[in-house]
């Protein structure tokens, strides 16, 4: 069984900045990590591989430094890693990104099952998984909270739909995006950490793919951030009481609250 996991290197949200001129995230000189829920997607693939056999391939699209999260995936147990990187891919929105990733997946070879985290912490669109499935012409289920693999080759997925849950049966190949509550990602082994630097890194560039260059990078991205502004939380109105008489200190806030209640009616 061939499993493939799409992961993303993201800026640590505590260090995140947006370029006000371009409306894009500043990724240089910022702390970067693997998107947290992508760890759950990777764990889902590794767990199934350990149970039924197969291989786990991990892919990411990004700048050369995104290699770091692929090495982290190797430390957890991934078998093969692919970095899709090219200046031509820069500035891609979800549509251009999913198109490029789908082309890279086709080049690698169609897996039986593709896992993605449901969304990234730097954009929260939850679009990449479904768009990859649509581009490849295969089924997808988003928001998986439980997965059961059937012997006949099908997949039973429980997905959250608001306050209710749906049970979906999938025929492979398919894409599944997962929720954090699906599992608890394993820790990297000492052997994995020591050996992650030795794993072969496969590089895929624009020249390696059979793609329409008008559909990649900024040119292929109809979605643009037009304005970025800080959100200032509303200030609460404060009342300071400076009365020596304890009874007056009690009467004042009661009267003030009574007055405000009438003003808001």
Residue ranges of model-derived segments:
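Anionic-ligand binding region
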Residues: 153-173
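Short Gly/Thr/Asp-enriched flexible loops that form oxyanion-binding sites at enzyme active sites
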Residues: 123-136
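N-terminal beta-strand-loop-alpha-helix module at the start
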Residues: 1-61
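A charged, well-structured terminal subsegment
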Residues: 169-197
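A glycine-rich helix N-cap at a beta->alpha junction
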Residues: 69-95
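Short, acidic/small-residue loops that bind anionic groups at enzyme active sites
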Residues: 134-152
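Conserved small/polar residues in nucleotide/adenosyl-binding loops
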Residues: 257-264
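Accessory alpha-helical/coil subdomains and C-terminal extensions
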Residues: 198-238
